[in-house]
Structures are given as structure tokens and as C-alpha cells.
């Protein structure tokens, strides 16, 4: 486990914008269709905004029509932690970066094959690293 989990709020406030802090560290949610990566289609990898851990490949991204970037699987097993979320009068499964505890969003069971899962992620919780062409 990374030492990122040991960082306090002052550390994260110095590294993140106010909106990123609200979403990543206080488990907020951005408005649907407002995030930077909702319509991104380029090839590459989505990293944790807080600690740069690779979380999702663009090949797993799909348009769920929900207003948030959606993926049918994480990059590899163990990079995402799941926890029951009973906030807002609902029962959902929260997803977080295993390395630093960054709130990413939620996972639902209405996704496409091959997994049937929809990892619904806030754009403010991730950053995109475009795949470099190898010549």
C-alpha cells in the first residue's frame, strides 16, 4: 500500500483544485456531462488524479449515456477498491483507487459484456495519458 493514504487534507488541498478535492477526497460527484473525459475517444490510459496509478485503459471505455466516463473493467485486478455506499438514500458500490483512497465514482451491474459492469467515474478523479505512437 502506498504512503498516499497517510497524506492529510492540507497535503491534498495543495495538490488538487477545490473541485478535485471535493470529489476525490470528500466523495463528491460532478454534474453529469460536465466532465473533461465524458467524450474522450483517444487511445491511452486513465490514471488516478491523486497518485497517478494507472486505473483504466481506453479500450475498456464505452458510452453509457449516463454523463460520466464509463469503463467495463479496470486496468488490472487490485487497482480499484470497492465499498458499500448508503449515502443519498441509495445502496451503491463506491469505487476508490487502492493506492491512495481517491474516490472515483461507483460501479453498477448494467454494463456491457464481457463483464456486465459499468465503472462510472468522475472526470475530476482521473487524468488521461495518451498512448504514444511507436515508430
From Swiss-Prot:
Tree of life domain: Bacteria
Pfam family, one: SelR
Keywords: Metal-binding, Oxidoreductase, Zinc
Catalytic residues (positions): 120 (nucleophile)
Residue runs in coiled coils: none
GO BP annotation list: protein repair; response to oxidative stress
Enzyme nomenclature, EC number: 1.8.4.12
One GO cellular component term noted in the UniProt record for this chain: cytoplasm
Keyword RNA-binding: no
Segments forming domain MsrB: 9-131
Catalytically driven reaction(s): L-methionyl-[protein] + [thioredoxin]-disulfide + H2O = L-methionyl-(R)-S-oxide-[protein] + [thioredoxin]-dithiol
Family label: Belongs to the MsrB Met sulfoxide reductase family.
PANTHER family referenced in this protein's UniProt entry, alphabetically: METHIONINE SULFOXIDE REDUCTASE, METHIONINE-R-SULFOXIDE REDUCTASE B1
HAMAP family linked to this entry: MsrB
Name of the molecule in the record: Peptide methionine sulfoxide reductase MsrB
Taxonomic placement: Bacteria, Pseudomonadati, Pseudomonadota, Gammaproteobacteria, Cellvibrionales
Gene, per the UniProt record: msrB
Amino acid at each position: 500500500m502506498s504512503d498516499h493514504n497517510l497524506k492529510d487534507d492540507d497535503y491534498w488541498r495543495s495538490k488538487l483544485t477545490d473541485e478535485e478535492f471535493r470529489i476525490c477526497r470528500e466523495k463528491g460527484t460532478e454534474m453529469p456531462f460536465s466532465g473533461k473525459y465524458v467524450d474522450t475517444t483517444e487511445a491511452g490510459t486513465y490514471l488516478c488524479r491523486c497518485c497517478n496509478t494507472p486505473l483504466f485503459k481506453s479500450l475498456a471505455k464505452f458510452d453509457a449515456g449516463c454523463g460520466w466516463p464509463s469503463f467495463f473493467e479496470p486496468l488490472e485486478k487490485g487497482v480499484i477498491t470497492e465499498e458499500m455506499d448508503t449515502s443519498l438514500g441509495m445502496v451503491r458500490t463506491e469505487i476508490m483507487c487502492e493506492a491512495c483512497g481517491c474516490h472515483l465514482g461507483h460501479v453498477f451491474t448494467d454494463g456491457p459484456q464481457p463483464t456486465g459492469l459499468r465503472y462510472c467515474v468522475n472526470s475530476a478523479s482521473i487524468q488521461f495519458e495518451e498512448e504514444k505512437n511507436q515508430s
